[in-house]
UniProtKB/Swiss-Prot annotation:
Cross-referenced SUPFAM superfamilies: 4-helical cytokines
Taxonomy of the source species: Eukaryota, Metazoa, Chordata, Craniata, Vertebrata
Tissue distribution: Expressed in the placenta.
Keyword terms of this UniProt record: Disulfide bond, Glycoprotein, Hormone, Phosphoprotein, Secreted, Signal
Pfam family, one: Hormone_1
Cellular compartments annotated: Secreted
Gene Ontology BP terms: animal organ development; growth hormone receptor signaling pathway; positive regulation of receptor signaling pathway via JAK-STAT; response to nutrient levels
Protein name: Growth hormone variant
InterPro entries: 4_helix_cytokine-like_core (IPR009079), Somatotropin (IPR034975), Somatotropin/Prolactin (IPR001400), Somatotropin_CS (IPR018116)
Signal peptide: 1-26
GO MF: growth factor activity; growth hormone receptor binding; hormone activity
UniProt xrefs under CDD domains: somatotropin_like
Family recorded in the similarity comment: Belongs to the somatotropin/prolactin family.
Protein species of origin: Homo sapiens
Length: 217
């Protein structure tokens, strides 16, 4: 084959490959509504697991006097995640932008990746369906990825790593005034339920603002 013909053939093949790449990048992305549906499904699942496990643990092990004393003492009821600035009421929540609410939700999820593994024995003994430390951790990681994807889509689509919650729960635990293992687990479950409720609420608000017809569901 002549050199000129070979060059022309290679050029044509290169242009064909380029057109394939361009077509591949033009594939439609996952609809925003589906991304929100997936994130909300995981958030609801996490909250339900947190709520059911908390209720089960409280009924089985915590006396009413202990519960009252725990909740009334700001030192024992202090949640590790309270170091994350979150809106304290509905009005302040509504004043936050979509990205702010997603960032807060992301940090709350990341804050539980370490301490949820300390509840291994609690989840192992729980009768709540799906309540194992591996399942809960996987749900947290899945939701972390889902929220990061939503943040990427709601911004300009440029790659980003997102904020990372890198404080250590173990440092907080060493300063804890609660040395009783039973009450320590109770406190973790109390805070886990509280934070998963926040995440679900924040995601629901952002979904309502971003996806037409999604409010109220």
């Amino acid at each position: 084959m002549a050199a000129g013909s070979r060059t022309s053939l290679l050029l044509a093949f290169g242009l064909l490959c380029l057109s394939w790449l361009q077509e591949g990048s033009a594939f439609p992305t996952i609809p925003l509504s589906r991304l929100f549906d997936n994130a909300m499904l995981r958030a609801r699942r996490l909250y339900q697991l947190a709520y059911d496990t908390y209720q089960e643990f409280e009924e089985a092990y915590i006396l009413k006097e202990q519960k009252y004393s725990f909740l009334q003492n700001p030192q024992t009821s202090l949640c590790f995640s309270e170091s994350i600035p979150t809106p304290s009421n509905r009005v302040k929540t509504q004043q936050k932008s979509n990205l702010e609410l997603l960032r807060i939700s992301l940090l709350l999820i990341q804050s539980w990746l370490e301490p949820v593994q300390l509840l291994r024995s609690v989840f192992a003994n729980s009768l709540v369906y799906g309540a194992s430390d591996s399942n809960v951790y996987r749900h947290l990681k899945d939701l972390e990825e889902g929220i990061q994807t939503l943040m990427w889509r709601l911004e300009d689509g440029s790659p980003r790593t997102g904020q990372i919650f890198n404080q250590s729960y173990s440092k907080f635990d060493t300063k804890s005034h609660n040395d009783d293992a039973l009450l320590k687990n109770y406190g973790l479950l109390y805070c886990f339920r509280k934070d998963m409720d926040k995440v679900e609420t924040f995601l629901r608000i952002v979904q309502c603002r971003s996806v037409e017809g999604s409010c109220g569901f």
